[in-house]
Every structure is written in C-alpha cells, then in structure tokens.
C-alpha cells in the first residue's frame, strides 16, 4: 500500500542523505579543534542570544513544528481547494484551523548551506538574508524586493506570481501572524552565525 511505499522512501532518504559527520558533530563528540573560533562564536549565538535553537533543535536542528515567520508571499503556493485566491496559507491548508494560517514547518538545518534559496517558497537567496529575516521579520518582509525571487521564466504565471505580495491586506495578515520575536545582532554576529551554519 502507499503508506509502506512512502515510509520506505523516507527511510531510504534519511539513511542516504542525512549527515551526522559534520565538523559540528565532531565538535560535539569531543574534537574541540573541529570548529573555528568564528564557528564556535556562531554556535554560541545559535544556542544563546540569537535564540535559533528555540525552533531549530534536536539532531536535525528542527523542532518539526509549524511557525509563522512572515516570509514574503509570492507564487501560487498551496491554496485551499475552494479559495479562488492564489495564496499559500501554510499549515491551515491541512488543519482548517485559522490559528495555523501562514505557519510552515521548521526546516532542518543539516547541510543548510546546500539548500538555497531559503524560506518555504525560496524568498531569500542566501543564509545571511534568511538570518536577517528571522532577526526582524516585519522589517524584512516590508523591505523585500521582487528581484529576490528566483522563479523560472513562465510568462503565463507571471500575472499571478505576485498577486498576494501586492495585496496590502494579505500582507498585513501575514505580518500579524508572525510568532517569533525580533532579535538584535550586529553584522559580525550575523557572519559568525552564517559561518556556524555553513
């Protein structure tokens, strides 16, 4: 049955593509030379001041829960079947619970430097930009530029790709759903976080 097939594929992917031999793992296993000082400072920020580990925790660096961080919305996403509006309401598509609106699953950060672009829809091209978004989601959402989107050339889709992004009421709903708090880091600290995650 389909459940067995899906579980088999998932087990294969976890076995083949999950890395637990990174410098971070070596550091945790006692090799204090595995990380540079910059990476150690980034790790300390990750688990401390930056509060990343409140959501990015466990062996996969994900709590496997759903959160709204106000990623700028573009593209059709996964709208609800009866919703004529091309928008992605996140977890609410599955639960029909308004409290899940615009919540997306916390991604695992294993090998995160290989998984750009970032955000559930690829809104940010670099680790630095998605970290900055997490630090101040309202400001970053409001300052997001259309050219950040890395979309395939599909003229027949261009008309709907930015309908949600251009809708002020929808943007206000996304921003009001944010459930993470701003954190203030300087550029040096952001670079340390990036170094740790890479």
Where do the language-model regions lie?
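Periplasmic c-type cytochrome electron-transfer domains
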Residues: 1-198
